[in-house]
Regions:
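C-terminal "cap" of GNAT-fold acetyltransferases
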Residues: 155-183
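A short beta-loop-alpha structural element at the N-terminal edge
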Residues: 29-43
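Acetyl-CoA-dependent GNAT
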Residues: 38, 45-96, 100, 105, ...
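Conserved GNAT acetyl-CoA-binding A-motif
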Residues: 125-139
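Conserved active-site alpha-helix within GNAT-family acetyltransferase domains
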Residues: 115, 139-161
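A short, internal acetyl-CoA/4′-phosphopantetheine-binding micro-motif in the GNAT/acyltransferase core
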Residues: 101-109, 137-138
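N-terminal amphipathic/basic-hydrophobic helices that include classical n-h-c signal peptides
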Residues: 1-18
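Conserved acetyl-CoA-binding loop-helix of GNAT-fold acetyltransferases
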Residues: 104, 110-124, 146, 150
Length: 183
């Protein structure tokens, strides 16, 4: 791991996520659940359509839905996946969920689904001792920075940032990735 030595910290005491004010009985209600193998194709489509995420193979999304279902979440409207968070627990830090990707269908953006998925995932994992979230974000991805900073603020907890990967760490052209830690 390479580090520029820069560490930025914002402090908020940890608390559970805010309750949703959107009724769950509306026809377009967003429901959250663990992904299933059958969701893998749809997750791949959502990721592909973002035009921003590093697209993994369709196999990777199907496998993720099988092997990391308990640390991931799918948002559905009328039983159709419209968003997802893929994550895993770090073996060397079992109290930490590492969020790999967050994506929401274009027609569902602006409804705070991404933030609500992250809150739902953290709330689901808290009884198992997960009290930290990590993710990597490229320095120019202001939307993701705002998303994760907002989640930390909503949960009244800290968020830190430090360089994790430089462009030289990748075999192809790839931006630097900063590590953000919530909790």
């Amino acid at each position: 791991m390479k580090s520029a030595g820069m560490l930025v910290t914002f402090e908020f005491p940890m608390r559970p996520g805010k309750e949703s004010t959107i009724p769950t009985t509306a026809p377009d209600a967003v429901l959250f659940r663990c992904p299933q193998i059958a969701d893998g194709v749809r997750l791949w489509e959502i990721a592909k359509n973002t035009d921003v995420l590093d697209l993994n193979s369709s196999y990777a999304y199907v496998l993720w839905c099988r092997d990391f279902a308990t640390t991931s979440i799918v948002a559905t409207v009328d039983d159709r996946p419209v968003g997802f968070v893929t994550g895993y627990r770090r073996q060397d830090a079992p109290n930490t969920v590492m969020v790999w990707q967050v994506a929401v269908d274009a027609d569902q953006r602006g409804k705070r689904i991404a933030g609500r998925m992250l809150h739902a995932l953290l709330d689901r994992l808290a009884p198992e001792g997960v009290d930290r979230l990590e993710t990597t974000i490229s320095p120019d991805n202001t939307a993701s920075i705002a998303l994760f900073t907002g989640v930390a603020r909503d949960r009244n907890t800290s968020i830190t940032k430090q360089e994790l990967f430089s462009p030289n760490d990748f075999p192809d052209s790839h931006e630097a990735e900063d590590l953000y830690t919530i909790g």
